Amino acid sequence: MVTIRLRRMGKTKQPSYRLVVADSRAPRDGKFIEIVGHYNPVRQPKELHVKADRVRYWLSVGAQPSETVVRLLKQVGVLDADGKPTPTATTPVEG
């Protein structure tokens, strides 16, 4: 199974995290498929950047976000209050 989770980076006592798509069996800081954002809780205000289109893609193909990632994605607006992806505006395609 593929998960969207945090990967710890940074120095000792100064953590920063990358939001990565990884196989659920891989170690926390091990091999990953794609980086979809980063989160720095040390800076004030806390810094969070997410590639929303890539996160929506991975959710659409069945990736499971961790509990912490769900909370962060709700803050950014990628997920709604129920934890489901927010709908995106689509444009009609001319045939």
Curated annotation (Swiss-Prot):
Entry's Gene Ontology BP terms: translation
GO terms, molecular function: structural constituent of ribosome
Keyword annotations of the record: Ribonucleoprotein, Ribosomal protein
Stretches that traverse the bilayer: none
Entry keyword annotation includes Cytoplasm: no
Pfam families, sorted: Ribosomal_S16
Family: Belongs to the bacterial ribosomal protein bS16 family.
Name this polypeptide is given: Small ribosomal subunit protein bS16
Gene expressing this chain: rpsP
